[in-house]
Swiss-Prot record:
Motif Nuclear localization signal, chain ranges: 17-32
Segments of this protein annotated with the region Transactivation: 120-135
One Pfam family of this chain: Gemini_AL2
Cellular component, GO annotation: host cell cytoplasm; host cell nucleus; viral capsid
Stretches annotated zinc finger (unnamed): 37-54
Domain of life of the native organism: Viruses
Complexes and interactors: Monomer. Homodimer. Homooligomer. Self-interaction correlates with nuclear localization and efficient activation of transcription. Monomers suppress local silencing by interacting with and inactivating host adenosine kinase 2 (ADK2) in the cytoplasm. Interacts with and inhibits host SNF1 kinase. Binds to ssDNA.
Metal-binding as UniProt keyword: yes
Annotated function: Strong activator of the late viral genes promoters. Enhances the expression of the capsid protein and nuclear shuttle protein. Acts as a suppressor of RNA-mediated gene silencing, also known as post-transcriptional gene silencing (PTGS), a mechanism of plant viral defense that limits the accumulation of viral RNAs. Suppresses the host RNA silencing by inhibiting adenosine kinase 2 (ADK2), a kinase involved in a general methylation pathway.
Family: Belongs to the geminiviridae transcriptional activator protein family.
Post-translational modification (record): Phosphorylated.
Biased composition range(s): Polar residues: 77-88
Name this polypeptide is given: Transcriptional activator protein
C-alpha cells in the first residue's frame, strides 16, 4: 500500500532504548566549587540554595560561590585562596562550634522512653504480633 503523503522523506521514531543509551553517555552537568580550605566539591547544575557545614564553616550553593573556569593560569585553581569577606550566620538553634564534640548518651539496660507506656509484652495476642510485624 502506498502512502497518501506526497513527501517521500518520512522520519522514523528513534527507539527508546537508543535514546536512553545516548542520555546515559551524556556528561553530568555539574559545577566545581572550591572552598577556602582548599577542598572542592561538585554540585549538580540544577541544585541550588542547599547548604552544608564543612570544617566549621557553613557553605551555601548560591550564585556567590560559583567561579568561571577559563583554563590555564586564569583558572581560580591556580590563584591563592583568600578568606571570604562575608560569612553566612548560623541559623538559631544550630550548634556549629568547630571545637565542640557532642557526647552520646550512654547505653543502658532499662526501659527506653518509647516502650515505657506499653503493657507487658507477654500479654500480646497473635493478632497484635501480626499487626506489629506488618509495620
Amino acid at each position: 500500500m502506498q502512502s497518501s503523503s506526497p513527501s517521500q522523506n518520512h522520519s522514523t521514531q528513534v527507539p527508546i532504548k537508543v535514546t536512553h543509551r545516548q542520555v546515559k553517555k551524556r556528561a553530568i552537568r555539574r559545577r566545581r566549587v572550591d572552598l577556602v580550605c582548599g577542598c572542592s566539591y561538585y554540585l549538580h547544575i540544577n541544585c541550588f540554595n542547599h547548604g552544608f557545614t564543612h570544617r566549621g564553616s557553613h557553605h551555601c550553593s548560591s550564585s556567590n560561590e560559583w567561579r568561571v573556569y577559563l583554563g590555564n593560569k586564569q583558572s581560580p585553581v591556580f590563584h591563592n585562596h583568600q578568606a571570604p569577606t562575608t560569612t553566612i550566620p548560623a541559623e538559631p538553634g544550630h550548634h556549629n562550634s568547630p571545637g565542640s564534640i557532642q557526647s552520646q548518651p550512654e547505653e543502658g539496660a532499662g526501659d527506653s522512653q518509647m516502650f515505657s507506656q506499653l503493657p507487658d509484652l507477654d500479654n500480646l495476642t497473635a493478632s497484635d504480633w501480626s499487626f506489629l510485624k506488618g509495620l
